[in-house]
Amino acid sequence: MDYSKTLALPKTEFPMRGNLPSREPQMQAVWEEQNIYQQVLDRTKDRPSFVLHDGPPYANGDIHIGHALNKILKDFIVRYKSMAGFYAPYIPGWDTHGLPIEQAIINAQGLDRRSIEVNDFRQRCEEYAWSYIDKQRDQFKRLGVRGDWENPYVTLLPEYEANQIRVFGEMAKKGYIYKGLRCVYWSPSSETALADAEIEYKDKRSPSIYVSFQVADGKGKLDIETGVVIWTTTPWTLPANLAISLHPELEYNVVKVDGRKFLVANGLIEAASKEIGWEGVEILATFKGQELEGVETQHPFYDRKSPLILGEHVTLDAGTGCVHTAPGHGEDDFNVGQKYNLGVLCPVDHEGKMTNEAPGFEGLFYEDANKVITEKLKENGALLKLSFFTHSYPHDWRTKKPVIYRATEQWFASIDGFRTQMLEAIKNVKWIPHWGETRLANMIADRGDWCISRQRVWGVPIPIFYCKACNEPIINDTTINHVADLFRKEGSKVWFSREANELVPEGLSCTKCDCNDFRKETDIMDVWFDSGSSHQAVLRERGIAWPADMYLEGSDQYRGWFNSSLSTGVAVYGTAPYKSVLSHGFALDGEGRKMSKSLGNVIVPQQVIDKMGADILRLWVASVDYQADVRISDAILNQIAEVYRKIRNTFRFLLGNLDGFNPATDRVAYEELGELDRYVLAKAAKVAKRTRKAYDEYQFHTVFHAVHNFCVIDLSAFYLDICKDRLYVEAPDSLKRRAAQTVMYDCLLSLVKLVAPLLPHTADEVWAFIPGVEEKSVQLTDMPEGDEQHLSFAAEAESKWDAFLAIRDEVLKAMEEARRNKVFGNSVDAKLALYPQTEEVAKTLAAMDDLADLFIVAHVDVHSGSAPAEAVQLEGIAAVVSAADGGKCERCRVVKPDVGTRESHASLCVRCADVVEQHYAHVTE
């Protein structure tokens, strides 16, 4: 007789294989059709809000793995918060102005920026930006990131630009905006000034030269045979030399070498001698730096003097202690030059070419001038040593080319005006990780004024007019409001399409000379001012929340968006625009190396999704400790895919065994559940509580491990394995079977909600198969908190069950050895004789019911005496594993002594015979 039809085997249409690359887009189409994002907002609209404000990616190129890491982390938080009692809108944004798009247009279309009409060029830039917004939007949505994708914020939109103008206006009104001649980072490759945040450091090979400036007037201290020795790595700045700086308190020695006299700082004689190749150095005289102030030296190739001046910036870190000072090419040089009224000489133009203020070197690119200048020094006998070395040097973060210091007139935001307020505001922000506070505070404490002007056209113009008669800059509430209103109506392009007199408010006249003829500023704002104004242009403009609950970006944004947003927030409103800041590390390859095409180690998110699915990539993000740099490779992703498979299989097993289960009518009351069932519910409640805490602390790798371990260890390898007999063999409506189904149902509901923020596609796929749920999506439910009744049971019974599981693990070792020795085939063919070696083990076993079920064997005997010689000695217990007595039941496959005692079903045990006769008579007739 075929008894297989009398078994309640798992049955579900939930597929074993995820087929995520094809199934996820279908799921996303359903979400879009149902407008699930709006449904979530409508459901939670009366709850307290949690606003994670999106830092805008740049609208250029495809998204990379760093983008994926960032957006997925944000999505984890937003999805969790919306299931945890909060109204959590998410408005994605894009940063759209700036040099990279200008450069992309110039390169792609072969344009000469200077020969094309400005608004035509800007229109091409805008079209380019929108094309990549559309592309990146699709790529972010494919990651499963939920948000208001149809209404993002974009820095080129008129309403955004208008808000940015108002932020600028407020800062100007408070006196924080000024125009000044300063030494700033200048990028010849971009032809514009740059801010600190636009600088990155890379290794560069540079010349290292020691040069002698001959004393022309020693002021009674130094004779004219003495050479003052300077050291520089930028020979091209020597045409701009106007002085030599000494530290007032340092000691300087006149030394004699090979018949020549030189001045060098006492603390650097040894190092300089080694570098230059001096031997037999004789000290002739010693002076304090302040004694030599006013001594004049002769410039090594121009007919002018370079005086010795005093500066606190001089150190003994390198060189000679006599510092070549070119106020046009260094911040310290500029500052000390102002003190001594040296003037500013900057003989390098916007392209990095030497001007006619550097006679003999006109037209040379500054780096090419190095060689010619060095040869000139050698010819004049001023070059003491030339060598080359590699050092860390500032580069333009966009073009990757070196930058220089160049004195130019620029617009600045005076950080000194609100530095103290910023440092105070930082203390009121929650920093994750905690070291973020110190990192940003140090940057704020040390930073100079913010250069906010750029000599480009694709950006938001600086809204300032100048009187044509007296050159007075005009900026006030009237002009700012007028320009902001114009931009809101027509966009910033209006600034470039109209003359200044068409842009000014009606009736405007110069406050200084009463003239009413104006010109307009031609510079645009730093793009960090664009994105740094987003708290105003998005959060306040849309009435969402201010300050935001969280900013979340890569750790490079301490000098970027975190910094610029803090600057504008504090300057305008006196406080930080965020309550908390979370930063993550960078994505590296499997060996911890930076990804690069040359190494062939680049992981492309789109390729991962096409091959494995977005939920695999998301699970990888959940698995890593993102606060440090994270690793990703094909091998790592394959490991993650295996974890996913185990989680999915757990879901499938639970669903399969809930076939025919109606939670409304088939649930077993908690009081009627067995102790094992209550123990597993207690474990599930603890997992829910631990997971909620981990989500609240943004510890997603803790969520990952908690869920994975619960699926694999507590369920698959323990409870579900033990329950198979109950589920398949017991009567369909029996208390034991329904009890197991009740536990499985509750575990399934809890698990699918706990993973929903991490694996939204899979969670909603599972949700569609769960019996008795009313909501269309798991996204429209709340997170489990951990049932208090279950948690209180955990407190009572956990130590007992943990002790038993430790014993069980030991006994399973003996069973595995017996299986290898062919004592039995399946565990239900075996019986156990257990010999506790301690009182604790004996008590634990005595307190357990149904030991045979718990060990998944035919029979268990616990003995109090000594273990026989053949027993396997284990930790705290000895065990004898042997073949069970009796016959193998054809239906339940367990070896039992009562098999064959029922004539009508001679191949069954009594239990199975009863079940068949009472519930499956129609099947076996």
UniProtKB/Swiss-Prot annotation:
Domain description: IleRS has two distinct active sites: one for aminoacylation and one for editing. The misactivated valine is translocated from the active site to the editing site, which sterically excludes the correctly activated isoleucine. The single editing site contains two valyl binding pockets, one specific for each substrate (Val-AMP or Val-tRNA(Ile)).
Gene3D superfamilies named among the record's database cross-references: 1.10.730.20, HUPs (3.40.50.620), Ile-tRNA synthetase CP2 domain-like (1.10.10.830)
Major location (coarse): cytoplasm
SUPFAM superfamilies assigned to the protein according to its UniProt record, in alphabetical order: Anticodon-binding domain of a subclass of class I aminoacyl-tRNA synthetases, Nucleotidylyl transferase, ValRS/IleRS/LeuRS editing domain
CDD domains the record matches: Anticodon_Ia_Ile_BEm, IleRS_core
GO BP annotations, alphabetical order: isoleucyl-tRNA aminoacylation
GO molecular function: aminoacyl-tRNA deacylase activity; ATP binding; isoleucine-tRNA ligase activity; tRNA binding; zinc ion binding
Enzyme Commission numbers on file: 6.1.1.5
InterPro entries, sorted: aa-tRNA-synth_I_CS, aa-tRNA-synth_Ia, Anticodon_Ile_BEm, Ile-tRNA-ligase, Ile-tRNA-ligase_type1, Ile-tRNA_ligase, M/V/L/I-tRNA-synth_anticd-bd, Rossmann-like_a/b/a_fold
Assembly and binders: Monomer.
Gene: ileS
Entry protein name: Isoleucine--tRNA ligase
UniProt binding sites for L-isoleucyl-5'-AMP: E553
Biological role: Catalyzes the attachment of isoleucine to tRNA(Ile). As IleRS can inadvertently accommodate and process structurally similar amino acids such as valine, to avoid such errors it has two additional distinct tRNA(Ile)-dependent editing activities. One activity is designated as 'pretransfer' editing and involves the hydrolysis of activated Val-AMP. The other activity is designated 'posttransfer' editing and involves deacylation of mischarged Val-tRNA(Ile).
Binding site for ATP: K597
One Pfam family named in its UniProt record: Anticodon_1
Subcellular location: Cytoplasm
Organism: Brevibacillus brevis (strain 47 / JCM 6285 / NBRC 100599)
Binding, Zn(2+): C889, C892, C909, C912
Keyword hit for Protein biosynthesis: yes
